[in-house]
Amino acid sequence: RQFENPANPAYHRQTTGPEILGDFAGRRLDFFVSGWGTGGTLTGAGEMIRLARPEVRIVATEPAGAALLSGAEFKPHKIQGWTPDFVPRVLNRSVPHEIVTVTDDESIAASRALASKEGIFCGISSGGNFAAALKVAEKAPEGSVILTVLADTAERYLSTVLFEGIAEGSDQEP
C-alpha cells in the first residue's frame, strides 16, 4: 500500500529531504537524480528540495523499457524496485524538471562498476540511479554538483542477473 499511502512521501519530506538540505546547507547542489518505484523518495525529497532550493534541477529516472512518466507503455524490466506497471497515486508528477531513462544493461553495468571500482555493493536500482546521474553529468555544465541515492544493497540480488556469470573466488580452478 506504499503506492497509495500519503505517509510514504511524507516520510521523505520529514527525513530524506531535510537530510539532503542539511548536508548541502551553504554548499552547491545543481541536480538531484532519483528513480521511482513507490514514488516516495522522488516526491517527498524532491518537493522539499524544490521548495528550499528552487535552483536545483530534479531529475526523475526510469527504465527505458517502462518509461511511464515519459509516456511509454510498460514492458517488463530488470530494475527491481523501480517502475511498477502503473504510476503510483502518491507520485507527484510536477516534481521532476526532466526525466532520464536508463536501460537494464546500463543499470547492471553501473552497479557492477560501483562494486568493482568504488567498493559500493549496491543493487540494480542504485545502479540505475548512478547510470542516470552519469548521463546528467555528460550534459551538465562543468563543475556541476550532482546527487543521487543508492537505496539498495546488492545482497538482495545474489540470485539475479546482477551476479550472472560471476564466479566465486573459491570456484575458480588453478
Can you describe what each PLM-predicted range is?
Residues 1-37, 93, 105-120:
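Active-site/ligand-binding-proximal alpha/beta "capping" segment
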Residues 11, 16, 25, 29-31, ...:
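Terminal helix/beta-alpha structural elements that buttress the NAD(P)+-binding lobe
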